[in-house]
Amino acid sequence: VYVLKTESSFPFLQEEILKSEDAEVPFEIGREEEAIQKAYNIFKEKIDQSLAEYLSNKEQTAEDNTKDAADWLSMLRDTVFDLNLILVTLDSEDDAYLIFETLNTRGKDLALADLLRNHFAKLIKAASEVDQVKQKWSKVQDTIKSSPVQLDPDTFIVHSWQSRYDFATKAKVFHKVKDTVNKKNAKSHLDRFVSDAEQWRSIFDTDYLWSKAEKEASRSLAALRTFKVVQPAPGILSLVRAYRDKQIKYRALRNALSNIEKFHFSFNAVTSSRSSGGISGMYSSFGRSIFEADDSSIAAQAIADLVGKLRDREVPAVEFDAGFQQVIYTNKHSSQKTLVQYILKKVAIH
């Protein structure tokens, strides 16, 4: 029987958890390892508490207490040994992928990232000892999870897809991918996710990939984080991608981001306006326009169209003034501290 051993938590699980002696192999601790350590500590704490209760029983002798504790440990061990392992033997590798997806519909939902990795693995067969899908998908995950900013791989996948193809919710993206990605185009789609991962991270982690000469663009992105706005992400991803691919100039990127920043400052940060619908779809549509643009003039027109749509949605001056008067920061009212800091920095710059 072939057993696939986990590598994501290797060698932490083997050295720190399963081994009774001190660890001999150095390892790095990430979020997965922290979760494993937390689970281990919970079990250990509960076992220690139960043993302490047996050993502190004052109604019988210490010898009887020790015997009861040993019997309880034996019972616990036997319970673990009595766990059943279900072995499923399949005729082909494709059947394994099918079962993987079928089980997902019966129990707890798997992460979108896991489903996509499985889909790519089914379509792209390893031509050598190097597992192309495994290496590339690990790069996607590492790029996102190594960010000091808390980022979600599933959200990245949704934004990447919306920026290129169509506006689909997280629940529908996997079905869209399955309908679009086949054996002929799987490699190119996988490569797109790999390249998009870095650009997407730089939208939220503004210390990543941005140079000092690009500080105005990174400031606008940092401002959107201050406003806690994620709706523009698909459109911004296409903008950053086009800039990195030298399809648009830095000036075009900077001006587009500045207009997006100004709109959401008044619409979200100051007035907390509610969208009547369509803003997320608008940014997704804009992202696709940039993605499909054959030259810089078409991209420039797409940016101009977006700026026009943002102006059409501008908050009336009366509403802005009323909202701005409510922006305060004191020792007792500190929830808007970052917004007040943003406003003061803007005043200082200008």
Language-model features: where?
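Glycine- and hydrophobic-rich flexible loops that cap the catalytic core of alpha/beta enzyme folds
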Residues: 1-167
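Histidine-centered catalytic micro-motifs used for acid/base chemistry in nuclease
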Residues: 350
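Active-site-proximal helix-loop elements at catalytic-domain edges
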Residues: 346
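A cross-family structural signal marking well-folded subdomains
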Residues: 57-62, 84, 113-343
